Regions:
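Non-catalytic interaction-recognition regions
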Residues: 1-121
């Protein structure tokens, strides 16, 4: 989980160095994120609040831990299948935003568990 957070941070640093910036959600064409691994990652991201609710209800932080491991797995599959760098500009921006949202959820989930989210490994 920490490695995937660091990997996303590295990706963002590299693309920022090439003149790209993480776009605002309003500047992304979400319809371009229609591939199987992209939609699986989006679905997994959408479950974060529910997992937080379950963890609070059950007084069981392992809900968050399991969720983060599953999210990291979804991101790994996405990153393996979907190119970000070198894609058409609109696709690059959409995938970069998806990666950044994943980074944010990983960071917040790790913080809830009292674990640092490294930007480099």
């Amino acid at each position: 989980v920490e490695y995937d957070h660091a990997r996303i941070c590295s990706l963002i640093r590299n693309l920022t160095g090439e003149g790209y910036a993480v776009p605002a959600a309003a500047d992304v064409d979400a319809a371009l994120l229609s591939g199987e691994t992209e939609t699986a990652l989006i679905k997994q991201l959408s479950l974060f609040c529910e997992e937080l609710r379950l963890a609070a209800r059950d007084y069981d932080p392992s809900h968050i831990n399991r969720y983060l491991v599953e999210l990291a797995g979804c991101f790994h599959r996405f990153y393996t299948v979907c190119r970000i760098k070198g894609e058409e500009d609109a696709v690059l921006k959409a995938r970069l935003k998806l990666a950044d949202e994943t980074r944010s959820v990983l960071k917040n989930g790790l913080a809830l568990l009292g674990v640092d989210a490294p930007e480099k490994m």
